[in-house]
């Protein structure tokens, strides 16, 4: 009986890990599509649309995704950084995502899901606190937005999105993105199919076109550290100062503001 319970627990753990990995890969593709087309898909809309409108994402200077970010005591599943300008005073948004997977989605108020919710909110609170302590110096206003997401293991449908109160911190958005990238410990694999485009013209043999693929590049996987497996998916890299490494290594006290940060985000996209 105990052995069967152990096997069941292991199989559930493996299923959860597989779902996490599939969702990571889907996020990479969905965010690349949203950046290119200015429209969020069904998965990303409940996660991003309230903070960063899709049309604004399309014109953002830099957008990056990092997975399994090692902050020491906590490891948020995904961190997305969006940069809206150049320089140390550029504004940005940093979305911390904690992912919880569900085998059954009909009832979202079961005891196990309530435990998952409480644990996820605690993890997000700790992740924000740890990230705020290690921000690189800078004067740009950056919104830290923690989000808890429940996902169905079958179909990877987003079942529920819960948000913690966002915070406004002051840092360098470009250096922050690089800092988070170096802490990433997982990168979704690149599919061989995604590197090809088939010719569909009538009477022409289907084949891969490397020139056309270069015009619409597939998001590349850049190792975060050459000597380790840690990597980050940088979809649309922003220009980073040459002294990024040195600047990121210096940590200064961070001023945090809780005064209506969502209103500030909305003001970024209001007509001038």
From Swiss-Prot:
Q: Where in the cell is it found?
A: Virion; Host cytoplasm; Host nucleus, Host nucleolus; Host Golgi apparatus
The organism's superkingdom is given as Viruses
Could you tell me the keywords of this UniProt record? Answer: Host cytoplasm, Host Golgi apparatus, Host nucleus, Late protein, Virion
Matching entries from Pfam families are given as: Herpes_UL24 (PF01646)
Q: Give the intrachain disulfide bonds.
A: none
Name a GO CC annotation attached to this entry.
host cell nucleolus
Expression induction: Expressed late in the infection cycle.
Cited function: May participate in nuclear egress of viral particles. Plays a role in the dispersal of several host nucleolar proteins including NCL/nucleolin and NPM1. Since deletion of host NCL/nucleolin negatively impact on nuclear egress, UL24 supposedly acts on this process through its effect on host nucleoli.
Instruction: Identify its protein family.
Output: Belongs to the herpesviridae UL24 family.
Q: Which protein, by its recorded name, is this?
A: Protein UL24 homolog
Naturally occurring in which organism (per UniProt): Equine herpesvirus 1 (strain V592)
């Amino acid at each position: 009986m105990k052995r069967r319970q152990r096997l069941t627990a292991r199989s559930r753990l493996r299923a959860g890990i597989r779902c996490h990995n599939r969702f990571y890969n889907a996020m990479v593709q969905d965010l690349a599509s949203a950046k290119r087309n200015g429209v969020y898909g069904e998965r990303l809309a409940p996660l991003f649309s309230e903070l960063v409108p899709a049309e604004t994402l399309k014109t953002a200077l830099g957008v990056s995704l990092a997975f399994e970010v090692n902050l020491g005591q906590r490891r948020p599943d995904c961190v997305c950084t969006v940069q809206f300008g150049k320089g140390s005073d550029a504004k940005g948004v940093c979305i911390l995502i904690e992912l919880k997977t569900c085998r059954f989605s009909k009832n979202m108020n079961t005891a196990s899901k309530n435990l998952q919710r409480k644990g996820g909110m605690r993890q997000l609170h700790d992740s924000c606190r740890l990230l705020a302590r290690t921000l690189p110096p800078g004067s740009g206003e950056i919104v830290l937005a923690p989000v808890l997401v429940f996902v169905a293991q079958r179909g990877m449908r987003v079942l529920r999105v819960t948000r913690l109160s966002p915070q406004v911190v002051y840092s360098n958005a470009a250096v922050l993105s690089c800092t988070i990238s170096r802490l990433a410990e997982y990168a979704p694999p690149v599919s061989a199919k995604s590197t090809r485009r088939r010719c569909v013209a009538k009477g022409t043999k289907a084949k891969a076109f490397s020139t056309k693929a270069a015009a619409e590049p597939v998001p590349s996987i850049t190792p975060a550290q050459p000597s380790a497996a840690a990597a980050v998916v940088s979809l649309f890299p922003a220009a980073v100062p040459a002294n990024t490494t040195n600047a990121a290594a210096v940590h200064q006290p961070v001023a945090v503001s809780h005064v209506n940060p969502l209103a500030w985000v909305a003001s970024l996209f209001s007509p001038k």
